[in-house]
């Protein structure tokens, strides 16, 4: 059994890798552009510095829906059952993952760091311009000073050493730098965390990719989700032949991995294993290539920052 998903689906893969309840239920995993980080994990019973407890959030939502000062009283269940389907849908409150003592007895950042996750062959990766889907040019800071002020505000005292990585060198790079920050802090750090955790356990079949093909404009980076039509072979009929070839290659990689636990096979460009020393990844582009330690300095610093935020939030 091979499980795989993208974005929210990638977050599901991340979650299944982390929970002991899924042990032995699958044999391989592919995570595309996961985004679960320590700052969007909620604890069931306790506030964790990033958010209030899941129970408090739920109680507040129910109280608001029932127009109650607090959720108490013998008639609370009847009032809850009186809600219409639409009213229930309107209660939606996004929570990425809840540490509940059952599915997870600790935060995933600890599970992956100690190597106690479900250790199966894994492909994990990200697109080189994930943030292009979420950052608009007209919303980017107008000056270098504005961008630095924004970074300092976002990163705080714990992220002082990270600020310079995400302030442009000149005003022509302001937008691209915003895209970098959005990509790295959400998707790329989390995807890389899975590769590092897997390699740390000695899992030989650990593979990391960077998807870098923008079919609309090959001179631009690949935004969030752009790899999906390539994986499923659903590019438009008018797509260039080289894009269709890349799509077939990616489909072959995914299927080969599902069958054997490695994307490598006869007639396929060699995809190097990811290990802690070389940190090699496959660049899925036209043409296919390999890279090593993709922007290692800032991503290592991003990891340290996220860990520091997590530790500070526990106290």
Located regions from the model:
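Catalytic nucleophile loop
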Residues: 9-13
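C-terminal, loop-rich substrate-recognition/catalytic regions characterized by aromatic stacking residues
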Residues: 117-165, 241, 251, 284-315
């Amino acid at each position: 059994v091979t499980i795989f998903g993208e974005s929210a689906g990638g977050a599901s893969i991340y979650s299944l890798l982390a929970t002991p309840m899924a042990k032995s239920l699958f044999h391989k995993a592919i995570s595309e552009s996961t985004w679960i980080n320590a700052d969007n994990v909620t604890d069931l019973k306790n506030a964790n510095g990033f958010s209030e407890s899941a129970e408090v959030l739920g109680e507040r939502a129910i109280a608001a829906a029932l127009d109650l000062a607090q959720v108490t009283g013998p008639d609370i269940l009847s009032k809850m059952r009186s809600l219409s389907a639409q009213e229930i849908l309107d209660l939606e409150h996004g929570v990425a993952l809840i540490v509940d003592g059952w599915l997870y007895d600790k935060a995933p950042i600890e599970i992956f760091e100690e190597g106690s996750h479900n250790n199966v062959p894994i492909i994990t990766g990200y697109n080189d311009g994930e943030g292009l889907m979420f950052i608009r040019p007209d919303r980017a800071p107008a000056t270098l000073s504005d961008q630095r002020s924004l970074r300092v505000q976002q990163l705080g005292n714990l992220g002082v050493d990270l600020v310079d990585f995400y302030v442009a060198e000149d005003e022509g790079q302001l937008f691209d730098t915003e895209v970098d920050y959005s990509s790295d802090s959400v998707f790329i750090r989390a995807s890389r965390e899975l590769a590092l955790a897997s390699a740390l356990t000695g899992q030989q079949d650990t593979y990391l990719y960077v998807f870098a093909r923008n079919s609309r404009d090959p001179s631009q980076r690949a935004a969030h989700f752009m790899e999906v039509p390539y994986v499923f072979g659903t590019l438009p009929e008018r797509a260039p032949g080289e894009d269709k070839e890349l799509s077939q290659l990616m489909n072959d990689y995914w299927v080969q991995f599902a069958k054997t636990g490695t994307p490598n096979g006869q007639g396929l460009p060699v995809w190097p294993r990811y290990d802690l020393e070389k940190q090699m990844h496959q660049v899925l582009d036209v043409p296919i290539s390999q890279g090593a330690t993709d922007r290692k300095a800032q991503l290592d610093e991003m990891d340290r920052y996220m860990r520091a935020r997590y530790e500070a939030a526990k106290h």
